Amino acid sequence: KIYREKYAFAVKCAKKYIPHKRILGEGGLHIFVELDENIDARLLLDKCIKRNVIFMPGDIFYTNGKGKNSFRLGFARSSLKEIEKGFNIIGEIIKEMEEEN
């Protein structure tokens, strides 16, 4: 039940803070977020690490070179406050990256 609530909260935060194409996952301990093609998730990760937010870039889950604009974020060990803060930071950095392009 706790993880179900965290999952629902994480999806809500992702939709609120992150400009996304789609959010994948049907529950569990992580969500997969697909961004616009112009956002490189590895570059996004480099910037997020500096603000203490980490995730797995999506391309590691593909063998065909796809997924460069996606990421998987786990939240099992994070509080609701940390989940919201993390998604807010990711969203801020994506907006900065879009302004740079």
Question: What name fits each language-model region?
Answer:
Residues 14, 33, 73-75:
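Preference for bulky hydrophobic residues occupying beta-strand positions
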Residues 50-51, 65-101:
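PLP-dependent enzyme catalytic core of the Aspartate aminotransferase-like
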Residues 15-23, 98-101:
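Surface-exposed helix-capping loop/turn segments at secondary-structure junctions
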Residues 33-71, 85:
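Conserved C-terminal alpha-helix-loop-beta "cap" of PLP-dependent enzymes
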Residues 2-11, 21-34:
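Conserved glycine-rich beta-strand-loop-beta hairpin in the small C-terminal domain of fold type I
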Residues 9, 13-17, 47, 93:
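Alpha-helical structural signal in soluble globular domains
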Residues 1, 21, 33-36, 62-63, ...:
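Short, contiguous acidic/charged loop-to-helix segments that flank catalytic cores in large enzymes
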